[in-house]
């Protein structure tokens, strides 16, 4: 016997796909699919077009690993930014969050993972841009503390100042879950790592 759901394969496939997005549960995925499929198909087409364009044009900056639509991102190519400070973050989305604060006028370096770090390229960048301070903007965890120590050890011969954003960012919490006032206060109160 066929069930009602068996006749809605395409719709249910859309719900399943939407449910794979972080922080979107089954109920939210159903509501989004229903809205896009029945209530606002024009928006669905706009989203489809925006996704195609993003997938076609999105890449990572060859200098800092942040998201970009060109080989070098706007931040790295901006001559007015302070060259003496390099803010290290874990993920490209962290650059968005910190840029929204408008507290940091230097440049960034996105780690993604320690295995992917090209220390030769990073060292070249430290010299070329005359970096004097590395700011670790990582959520406070024991693993991230170890990561900071590892990076400090690898770059100690540059005699840099290493700082980290101040505590006040709760341990184990990602930036997207912190209010902007707390994150701004923590960033402006950074301390020597």
Swiss-Prot record:
Q: Which GO terms describe its molecular function?
A: DNA binding; zinc ion binding
Q: What keyword terms does UniProt attach to this protein?
A: DNA damage, DNA recombination, DNA repair, Metal-binding, Zinc, Zinc-finger
UniProt name for this protein: Recombination protein RecR
The entry sums up its family as follows: Belongs to the RecR family.
Q: Start and end residues of each C4-type zinc finger?
A: 61-76
NCBIfam families (UniProt xref):
recR
InterPro entries referenced in this protein's UniProt entry, alphabetically: DNA_Rcmb_RecR, Rcmb_RecR, Rcmb_RecR_Znf, TOPRIM_dom, TOPRIM_RecR
Please indicate if the UniProt record lists DNA damage as a keyword. Answer: yes
Which parts of the chain span the membrane according to its record? none
Q: What does this protein do?
A: May play a role in DNA repair. It seems to be involved in an RecBC-independent recombinational process of DNA repair. It may act with RecF and RecO.
| Pfam families tied to this protein | RecR_HhH, RecR_ZnF
Q: Where is the Toprim domain?
A: 84-170
A single GO BP annotation from the record?
DNA repair
Q: Does the keyword DNA damage apply?
A: yes
